[in-house]
């Protein structure tokens, strides 16, 4: 029988367990699905809650301590207690303040835990063993502290899976300071005392972001911070906004549901962040004696290729459908661009790829994220630009850039098709129109129509209903354009975007969306004729050594 007592939170009083000679292990859930959890929980429970229940049920864990740092932990306790399979299930009440009364409250909770453990084990608490574990834990935390340049991971539980994935995407170590990461108690006294231990546990360094107080030690070697949140979690978003307002460090916010994530969107966010802080795993070297450079943007809908000469002038360009495979689509686009320029593959000094297929096309000398490439391409096309709005087939991005085209910050909408080119493409098919026809008709509207749902499937149902009511196609298209513009303007405002605005990507060809977006932002949105080539242009420019 497994006598291990499992736990999750870094506020777990592990030293108390050591005083009872009880082995402990921190759970690090990363289920592939929530099959067990969804059979006994509400669907809106956060991903971490479901992941933890899934882990407990599938591993048949019978001993568990939870800390009631949030409602989800309380609900996990309720579910597991109701099932009646646990031999030991303890919910520790954790104060959110560090006043004297808070320490007293936690001390009483620790004494209650000792009573429960006495009943479970039949053994008395050994304060010397607990004190030894306390001191050992401090030494362990010191060994875990990274003193070389690194990236901090903070916020909600990310686990080994997320930490390793981030480390694979950038050549820097990651310091895990999430709520289940590095545990740094205050120094131990010479003799055990419940009050001193309660105070040390409550006032540990890198305090939980849910606390109403902050105990932070300086981290001068951190070059950037990744703030991780869980879907449906209400806590960490507020802390992230507070940190952003301070503007003291380079921040990236990511969100997962605790299942294994290898999506292109998450990789794009992390890779772009690495490039922003100068830690890209695939740093592009400047080509010498340049004659011709090719940039290839392998997107979800189209693959764009551009060839620049030594003067950074566009020699040829091509836009082709990506088709069934990113690699074959990129090969065709590059071949077409070479043919148009009257060049051969060996005439190119370098090929740089970007887009979601950038790492799989297999024809490049280097690759970079579309965040960096669109920033460089936008600066090339419109040097006055300070905010880049890129709406592609699969996602939409807003990028703030400086006077040199360097990325200052960015946000992405990549969770669904809403507000993207795919959304408009599906609506065009529903209306039996081509995208150019849709662009023209959208400017001829007469009556205001509101598309209330931003979900692609539900919006399609609304469009079908409007068609059934004989609503003019022009008015329906205007409603769709306003819907896309509204979602995009929200991203711009969230990022703090400012004029001058430039729009790139395929949706920039839709005049109705551009007009609605300009109206909502209160400033003209510039659309260059090479808008859809912006990413490929930026990729090629990177080979010139532009940073």
Segments from the language model and where they lie:
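An N-terminal assembly and electron-transfer interface module characteristic of large anaerobic redox
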Residues: 1-293, 311-313, 323, 416-423
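Conserved phosphate-binding/catalytic loops in two-lobed NTP-binding clefts
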Residues: 248-257, 370-371, 518-537
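Glycine-rich phosphate-binding/hydrolytic loop that grips phosphoryl groups
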Residues: 268, 421-425, 528-547
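Gly/Thr-rich phosphate-binding beta-strand-loop-beta motif of the actin/hexokinase/Hsp70
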Residues: 287-311, 386-405
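Short glycine-rich, Thr/Ser-proximal phosphate-binding strand/loop in the N-terminal lobe
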Residues: 296-328, 332, 336, 407-415
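Glycine-rich phosphate-binding loop plus the immediately following alpha-helix
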Residues: 322-326, 408-443, 447, 541
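Glycine-rich phosphate-binding loops at beta-strand->alpha-helix junctions
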Residues: 356-357, 493, 497-520, 531-532
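Adenine-nucleotide phosphate-binding core of ATP-dependent small-molecule kinases
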Residues: 459-492, 532
């Amino acid at each position: 029988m497994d006598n291990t007592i499992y736990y999750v939170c870094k506020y777990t009083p592990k030293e108390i367990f050591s005083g009872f000679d009880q082995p402990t292990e921190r759970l690090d859930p990363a289920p592939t699905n929530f099959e067990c959890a969804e059979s006994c929980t509400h669907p809106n429970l956060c991903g971490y809650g479901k992941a933890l229940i899934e882990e407990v049920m599938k591993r048949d864990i019978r001993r568990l301590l939870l800390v009631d740092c949030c409602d989800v932990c309380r609900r996990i306790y309720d579910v597991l207690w109701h099932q009646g399979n646990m031999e030991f299930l303890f919910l520790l009440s954790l104060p959110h303040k560090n006043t004297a009364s808070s320490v007293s409250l936690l001390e009483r909770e620790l004494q209650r835990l000792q009573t429960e453990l006495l009943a479970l084990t039949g053994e008395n608490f050994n304060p010397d063993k607990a004190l030894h574990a306390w001191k050992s834990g401090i030494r362990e935390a010191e060994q875990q502290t990274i003193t070389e340049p690194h990236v901090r991971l903070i916020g909600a539980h990310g686990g080994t899976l997320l930490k390793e994935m981030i480390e694979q995407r950038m050549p820097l170590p990651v310091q895990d300071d999430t709520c289940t990461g590095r545990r740094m108690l205050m120094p131990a006294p010479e003799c055990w005392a419940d009050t001193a231990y309660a105070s040390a546990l409550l006032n540990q360094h890198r305090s939980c972001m849910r606390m109403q107080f902050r105990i932070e030690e300086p981290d001068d070697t951190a070059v950037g911070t990744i703030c991780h949140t869980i879907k449906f979690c209400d806590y960490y978003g507020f802390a992230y906004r507070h940190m952003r307002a301070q503007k003291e460090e380079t921040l990236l916010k990511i969100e997962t549901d605790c299942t294994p994530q290898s999506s292109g969107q998450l990789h794009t966010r992390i890779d772009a962040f690495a490039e922003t802080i100068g830690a890209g795993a695939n740093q592009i070297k400047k080509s010498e004696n340049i004659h011709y450079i090719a940039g290839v943007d392998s997107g979800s809908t189209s693959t764009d290729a551009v060839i620049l000469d030594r003067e950074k002038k566009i020699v040829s360009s091509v836009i082709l459908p990506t088709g069934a495979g990113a690699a074959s689509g990129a090969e065709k686009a590059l071949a077409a661009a070479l043919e148009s320029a009257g060049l051969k593959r060996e005439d190119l000094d370098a090929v740089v790829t970007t887009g979601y297929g950038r790492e799989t096309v297999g024809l490049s000398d280097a690759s970079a994220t579309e965040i960096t490439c669109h920033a460089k391409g936008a600066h090339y096309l419109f040097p006055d630009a300070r905010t880049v709005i890129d709406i592609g087939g699969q996602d939409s991005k807003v990028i703030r850039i400086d006077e040199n085209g360097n990325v200052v910050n960015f946000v992405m909408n990549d969770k669904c098709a809403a507000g993207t080119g795919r959304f408009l493409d599906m609506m065009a098919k529903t209306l039996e129109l081509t995208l150019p026809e849709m662009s023209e008709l959208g400017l001829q509207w007469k009556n205001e129509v509101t598309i209330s749902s931003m979900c692609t499937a539900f919006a399609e149902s609304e469009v079908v209903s409007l068609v059934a009511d004989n609503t003019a196609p022009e008015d329906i298209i205007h409603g769709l354009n306003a819907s896309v513009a509204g979602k995009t303007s929200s991203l711009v405002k969230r990022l703090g975007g400012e004029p001058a605005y430039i729009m790139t990507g395929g949706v920039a060809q839709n005049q109705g969306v551009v007009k609605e977006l300009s109206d909502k932002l209160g400033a003209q949105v510039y659309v260059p004729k090479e808008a859809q080539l912006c990413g490929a242009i930026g990729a090629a420019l990177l080979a010139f050594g532009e940073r």
